Structures are given as C-alpha cells and as structure tokens.
Amino acid sequence: MPSNSKFRFSSEPEPHKLRTKQILASSPDVRNLISKNPFTIIPLVALVAGMVVISWLLKDSPWWLILLVAYTVGAFANHALFVMIHECSHNLLFKGKTLNFLASITANLPHVLPSAVSFTRYHRMHHVHQGNHELDADLPDFWEARVFGNNFFSKALWLLLFPFFQVRRTFRLKNIKPVDGWIITNWVFQFAFDAAIWIFFGPKALMFMLISFFFSVGLHPLGARWIQEHYLVLDENQETYSYYGPLNLLSFNVGYHNEHHDFPSIPWNKLPQLKQSAPSFYDTLKSHQSWTSLFFRFLFDKNVTLHSRILRDDKAKEKTIAIEDKGIKYY
C-alpha cells in the first residue's frame, strides 16, 4: 500500500479516456447505450413524496424512533435521490439542461441543504480533471487529509461531517462561479420547501430529513461509496473502483463507477449492459462487493486514510490532452 501520510503523485494520464477509446474500437455497438432515460423522473418524484410522507408520520415521534428510521430508511431514500442528482448533472434524464436542473433541484428537496446545482458544476470538473487538486473537488484538501490522520475516531468524525468538507473543497475551484442564477433558484426552492415542512409538519419532520441526509453520505455503510470510488484500497495502481454488491438495486447502479467514468453519457439502467459488452476491460479490474465491509475497513485500517488518493502533475495533464478524442463527451 502507498504511504498513509501523503498522497501518491502520478505523471500518467487518468485511465478513463484511454479505456473509452479502446472499448469503442473493440465494441463500437457500445455507442448505442448512450442515451437519456426520462423515466428516471418517476422514482425521483416517488422518493421525494415518500420522504415527505415519512417526515409527516414522524412529526410527533420520539427522537430514538426518528434516528432509527433515518438510519434504516431515510438514508437509503436520500442516497438514491443523491444518485438522481448525479444523473441530472450529466443531463441523463432529458435533452435540455433546464429540465435536468429542475429535476435535480426537486431531488435535492429532502436533503434540506441546497447542493444540486453546485454539485453539477464541480462534478463535471471531477470527470474532466480527475486527480488535479486545483480542479477536482472530489480530492480532500491537503489540510483535511493531514488533520484526520489514520485513527478510528478521526475518520469516523470525517465521515459524520463529510458534507461540510465537500462544500469547503469547492472554494479551491477558482474557475467556477460560487453564485449564479441556477444556484439562487436552487436556494429559493430549497428554503421554501424547508420552511413549508417546518411550518406544516414541525421541526422534528425537518430534522428527520436532515439526519437522513447526513447518514446517506456519511457515518453509514452508504458513506463507504465515497471511499469505494477512488481510494487506493485494493491496489495502489488502480484509482477507480466499481461496486457490484446488492445495494446497487437501491442505489440505481451508482456502484458501476469505472463504467460511469468511461461513459458518463450512459444512464444508470444501462451501465450493467456496458460491463457485459466489454468483459475483457471490466472483469480484469479489481472491484468492491460490500459497502459495509469497506465502511469498517476504512474506519479500522490505519493504512487507508484520506491520503489514499492519486494526484496528477502537469505532465499527466499533457498526456491526458494528447489521448482525448474530440468526438467523445467525457463529462
């Protein structure tokens, strides 16, 4: 394993652009999987409605029950809605950006905190500039990785507060506007929704949603998804990993992360077909089978830290540009 006290630097290009070209050369029919899935709006709206109903049912419940339902039900619903926001960020529901933004803002509502539009901005940068610390907000800040070290308690705290650190990272992306019309729209809809839940259902209903959100991306087996995607847990030379476990059924195949990075224009329902269409490329890669197992390994394994990531230098950037195909959309 690489050192747990510093990032691993690489002068090589990120693996996805080259693999995309290779797969298209060997299996050109994969292009047929590139499409939109407007039917995704159905589970999206159903999940939002479900969270509203559950919050109403819990509005007068004891805190222990609110915490229990948030951990066992709300976290899964909010995680699925985060995946819906992710789909919208790649314009995978509808052709126009406007409808995708509106869908993502709708999916954002049970999260309590407005993040859908800003996520779209920095997530696309992550795809284009993977491993570039100044442009990839998926990478921990240098101070963040140093402060939280390799012990159980600090890593548990990091997972618990993950949303705050994710927001903080976006400030280092200088070429993204912190505020624009769509971000303001996101805020207006979000805070109006929050106010309505508070006024008509009460503070416990809103807190149920907020707690569910923090569990969905943090101190919960679902939070292991952030470790699964790019942390050097299984191989110091493989920086992206897929997850093929059963929770993909509840998470709209978000575990198919290598497949998604290779072809971000393929919607969630067709990612398994992509894997089946290119077995020589994907079956040879290491992958995770359990988020729960990875969750505990991250917490207890001192060799897995926030430094377990690959950073790229300028030489890697030049090599990446050299292999890019202008006919392929990489975000």
Residue ranges and their predicted role:
Residues 81-90, 119-131, 225-234, 250-266, ...:
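Histidine-centered catalytic micro-motifs
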Residues 73-85, 115-117, 163-167, 209-236, ...:
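Transmembrane alpha-helical segments that form the membrane-embedded catalytic/substrate-channel core
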Residues 84-103, 135, 139-140:
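Aspartate-rich (DDxxD/NDxxD/DxxxD) Mg2+/diphosphate-binding motifs
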Residues 95-102, 118, 215, 270:
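Short acidic-hydrophobic sequence patches enriched in Asp/Glu that either
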Residues 101-109, 238-251:
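Membrane-cytosol interface motif
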Residues 56, 94-95, 135, 238, ...:
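Short, function-defining helix-loop hinge/capping sites that tune catalysis or transport
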Residues 1-74, 84, 109-209, 269-270, ...:
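Non-catalytic, topology-defining segments of multipass membrane proteins
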